[in-house]
Amino acid sequence: MAGLGGEPIPDGEFTAVVYRLIRDARYAEAVQLLGGELQRSPRSRAGLSLLGYCYYRLQEFALAAECYEQLRQLHPELEQYRLYQAQALYKACLYPEATRVSFLLLDNPTYHNRVLRLQAAIKYSEGDLPGARSLVEQLLSEGGEDSGGENELDGQVNLGCLLYKEGHYEAACSKFSAALQASGYRPDLSYNLALAYFSSRQYASALKHIVEIIEHGIRQHPELGVGMTTEGIDVRSVGNTLVLHQTALVEAFNLKAAIEYQLRNYEAAQETLTDMPPRAEEELDPVTLHNQALMNMDARPTEGFEKLQFLLQQIPFPPETFGNLLLLYCKYEYFDLAADVLAENAHLTYKFLTPYLYDFLDAMITCQTAPEEAFVKLDGLAGMLTEQLRRLTKQVQEARHNKDDEAIKKAENEYDDTLEKYIPVLMAQAKIYWNLENYPMVEKIFRKSVEFCNDHDVWKLNVAHVLFMQENKYKEAIGFYEPIVKKHYDNILKVSAIVLANLCVSYIMTSQNEEAEELMRKIEKEEEQLSYDDPDKKIYHFCIVNLVIGTLYCAKGNYDFGISRVIKSLEPYNKKLGTDTWYYAKRCFLSLLENMSKHMIVLRDSVIQECVQFLEHCELYGRNIPAVIEQPLEEERMHTGKNTVTYESRELKALIYEIIDWNM
């Protein structure tokens, strides 16, 4: 008989070879050998049993269930195969089939308790929490032949899981913590406890257990290659082995990434995902795929949409997938796609969208065709949320008066959750008037919400923007921009470049030139330090600040100074020329050319020569820089040769020559 690689297996050695492969966890190779053997002896009980075991270990649960189905038909007297089939069906998320198969074992006292545990797990996975609780409590009260410490421990863990699903996170923490103390270190229990802490916003406690899982996994299984992908080491996939599953490393890294994302440490969240044991994309579990899509959306939106759309076709998928896909469609203004997905998946709407999220999405989609109607819908939603916020404010005050720490924490968490729902509604209302350039109305909307939002960074930032846009409220804008900048003053490049630029312009427009210069020196100094630490990294903050200041002077008609500032801001071109910086620069040039063509301004020859030289430099360095970042789901893509800084530089240079000849 031929073995792996075509080498013959000596007579009588086949079974030994298969068992050695299984002993060494080389299940895929064992499957290959067993598959060949079963083609010759399809009714072999040993072959089918080992094949089912290997498939189960490889987490190919549907294939394992098929093997046990065949064994059940060939050997109906051996009821363990019915149990194995039910377990494999459950793991494959085929819950109705698993329930049907397991019911036939309930009357067998040998398997009664194991079947009850399996049925409780099925009901839990289906979302039938009362049914699951009933079975768990039945198990705890009945006991059985395998009753005792282990059974009691499992029961307490199961109760912890039910408490978690019911939203009783503190009680769930107590159950998991007690179970962990009773059992000693177990990765799955540590993860459960970390998840419960995460859901109750105790991130430090959650991270403590996550770090323990990761460190334990690295020590016990260095072969899993934790962190190697982040370090740029080319490593092969470790596959979806049972060992990987037992370490809870994938779950721990996903939870750590979620915590970093919640804390707005987006780079750390992305790095956490690449730290997990390496697997091929087709091997990734749904949660990892979902998190990859979400956390890399800004850099790779097309890929992110593809992953979320793919997940929506899988059963099961992470429950957040449906809502996140719809929200991202709205963020990128694909309202038609959002409406189509809602219409095509009405059955998912009731299961995965809260009434709040459904109403919010409905209003966002309506914005495209009927902004006035959308505003009314959003106003209704905002009114409901403000009532909740006032009620929760009162609850917090009462709890503080009564010195009830538990009630204070609960009310404050509910308040924060409600505020996080209110802010997007408020911003969606404001955006309707922002798009109409009705900035006083936007300001009015924000002022109505000051009672709840005056400490919220997103609210303060947008108030600053709307004051800045009115051009006569620079002093008020400074009052909102300054705290944002000072909060991150020691790491100023963490602040958005446009915020720094707008603050500098506001200083200049209110004759606070010294403050503007001090801020610009601070930005320049930090950029120089960062360039020293990482010479290849492109940093645009100082450049964008200068571009915006140059744009301001151009807008005021001082093109000589404004254009000169724009040109100098992009030096050196290999580090400062990018899609964003080119956007600001070309706007100034287009404004300049428009005014020249209308004979409204006349530039000195030296300035024109400086402009031509600048565009020639952009032409040279802009060959591989997109002039425009295209929307991720556009069907008609721009011509790749035209969507470059080089192409647009040539167009602008040609226009300059045309206008100069015309003037002459």
UniProtKB/Swiss-Prot annotation:
Q: Name one GO molecular function term.
A: intraciliary transport particle B binding
* Pfam families to which the protein is assigned, alphabetical: TPR_16 (PF13432)
Cellular localisation: Cell projection, Cilium
Q: Name one GO biological process term.
A: intraciliary transport
Q: Which UniProt keywords apply?
A: Cell projection, Cilium, Cilium biogenesis/degradation, Coiled coil, Repeat, TPR repeat
- Please verify whether the record's keywords include DNA-binding: no
Q: Which residues form a coiled coil?
A: 507-534
Main subcellular localization, coarse class?
A: other
* Cellular component terms per the entry's GO annotation: axonemal microtubule; intraciliary transport particle B
Q: Where are the TPR repeats?
A: 11-44, 45-78, 153-186, 188-220, 392-423, 424-456, 458-491, 543-576
Q: Mind telling me which SMART domains this protein's record contains? A: TPR (SM00028)
**Free-text function comment from the UniProt entry:** Required for polyglutamylation of axonemal tubulin. Plays a role in anterograde intraflagellar transport (IFT), the process by which cilia precursors are transported from the base of the cilium to the site of their incorporation at the tip.
The similarity comment for this entry is:
Belongs to the TTC30/dfy-1/fleer family.
Recorded hits in PANTHER family, A to Z, give: TETRATRICOPEPTIDE REPEAT PROTEIN 30
Protein name according to UniProt: Intraflagellar transport protein 70A
> In the UniProt record, what gene is named as encoding this protein?
IFT70A
